[in-house]
């Protein structure tokens, strides 16, 4: 999952720093992630994992780091399996 998120981030994140040099816990907004790029990132993640972000998870915290994105995707996938 981490590798897939990193690939999507590299494609849509428009970051000035190479994604492979960014730590899982690093602040993506401090690394240069814009609000526009975060929307593109979200759409890429939704497509890759066949999920839809619920309104309550559409926030800066969900996309703050690679780890945060991974945790959010896992939360959505767990909820999807339970449904």
From Swiss-Prot:
Residue numbers carrying O-(pantetheine 4'-phosphoryl)serine: 35
SUPFAM superfamilies, per the entry: ACP-like
Domain spans labelled Carrier: 1-80
Disulphide linkage map: none
Keyword terms: Phosphopantetheine, Phosphoprotein
Description of post-translational modifications: 4'-phosphopantetheine is transferred from CoA to a specific serine of the apo-form of this carrier protein.
Organism superkingdom: Bacteria
Function: Aminoacyl carrier protein. Can be charged with L-alanine, L-glycine or L-serine, via the formation of a thioester bond between the amino acid and the 4'-phosphopantetheinyl prosthetic group, catalyzed by the Atu2573 ligase.
Name of the protein in question: Aminoacyl carrier protein
């Amino acid at each position: 999952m981490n590798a897939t998120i990193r690939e999507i981030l590299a494609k849509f994140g428009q970051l000035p720093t190479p994604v492979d040099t960014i730590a899982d816990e690093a602040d993506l907004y401090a690394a240069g992630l814009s609000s526009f790029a975060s929307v593109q990132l979200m759409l890429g993640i939704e497509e890759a994992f066949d999920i839809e972000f619920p309104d309550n998870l559409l926030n800066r915290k969900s996309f703050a780091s690679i780890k945060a994105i991974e945790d959010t995707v896992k939360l959505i996938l767990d909820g999807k399996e339970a449904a």
